[in-house]
Amino acid sequence: EVRLQENDLIVSKTDMKGRITYVNRTFMRISNYAEHEVMGKQHNVVRHPDVPRGVYRLMWDTLKAGNEFFGVLKNLTADGHFYWVLANVTLDRNATGEVAGYFSVRRSVSPDAVREASDLYAEMLRIERQAGSAAAPEASLAWLKSAMAERMVSFEQFTLASCRD
């Protein structure tokens, strides 16, 4: 596992199709990718298979609704290691205010936040395996929404509460 320092901020930008248009040095250092290896590639190049597809469905639904997304995510490095982050993804607007892409800032998370996310994601992954590939994202997202409703919080509230020290 690659551990982020408290002051590490991983920054990346993508176009509307999710292709990387910018990464900062911290992104390159933590992910072990050189800039030329990721520019123009889909941002899911760092997606770890332990994060359910339903979480990414929620992220895209949230962004398409014009809102920012917060989530604890496990990412994959170029050499097969992983790192956990608190991700904040927002719309990236051009000078005229039109959405031109997406802007993501990721930072370190506590072991407690990782534990909570891991437990949630394990159940979502179990549901995705049972649902089959095509139905997997919707099935696990439905379960996630139900689990959050039982706790009377949104996924964002759950995420941010789990990240408080």
Identify the meaning behind each predicted range:
Residues E1-R126:
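Sensory/regulatory domains in signal-transduction proteins
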Residues T96-E156, C163-R164:
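Sensory coupling linkers of modular signal transduction proteins
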